[in-house]
Design a protein with these regions (language model features):
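Alpha-helical membrane segments of multi-pass proteins
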Residues: 1-182
Length: 182
């Protein structure tokens, strides 16, 4: 039976991940002086992910319109990651980078992050994988997690404020290349 297009879905994985991220952020924000706009950006990023995957959008995407599924992908890979990263203070981002070590430093280099973004988008949208993901909830969750991850990796060089941060024109070119090629 096909559900009502206005019915809400319940995807516990992304609700739980959103809750864990919110609690971790709240703890870190309590120790630092985080401006309200960073808190709002982080909350909006979590709301986009949880809302895209636990609302009528999910029902419509899964049972009615492929276009809505593509909108979900854009919400969780293109819109939520920059909001989540902007929500982090420079000190929080530096702590994450330190925790990630060399591997994190490597994958967030623009010359590595851009190919990861492109290969990720293309791989997820290969017809066989895409069709399988639309029929298998576990694969669909894996697809959504991958989109969030590649989104965070792609957006890190744009949002980063490290000593080796990209200049504004290079950030614009990087974003242009990423969106034109994907």
């Amino acid at each position: 039976m096909i559900p009502d297009p206005y019915s809400f879905t319940f995807e516990p994985l992304f609700i739980a991940l959103g809750a864990v991220a919110a609690v971790a952020y709240a703890r870190a924000a309590r120790r630092a002086d985080v401006p309200w706009w960073r808190i709002a950006a982080f909350a909006a990023g979590i709301a986009l992910v949880v809302g895209a995957l636990n609302s009528p959008l999910e029902t419509i995407a899964a049972h009615y319109l492929l276009l809505v599924h593509l909108l979900q992908n854009v919400m969780i890979a293109d819109w939520a990651p920059p909001l989540l990263l902007i929500g982090l203070t420079p000190a929080m981002r530096a702590a994450l980078a330190r925790r990630g070590g060399r591997a994190f430093a490597f994958v967030t280099r623009p010359q590595v992050a851009l190919p990861i973004w492109l290969v990720g988008w293309y791989a997820i949208h290969l017809a066989a994988f895409y069709d399988a993901a639309l029929r298998n909830a576990w694969l669909l969750n894996l697809e959504h997690l991958a989109l969030i991850a590649i989104g965070l990796v792609f957006w890190w060089p744009v949002v980063s404020d490290t000593p080796h941060a990209l200049s504004a024109p290079v950030r614009i070119a990087y974003l242009g290349a990423g969106f034109a090629l994907s």
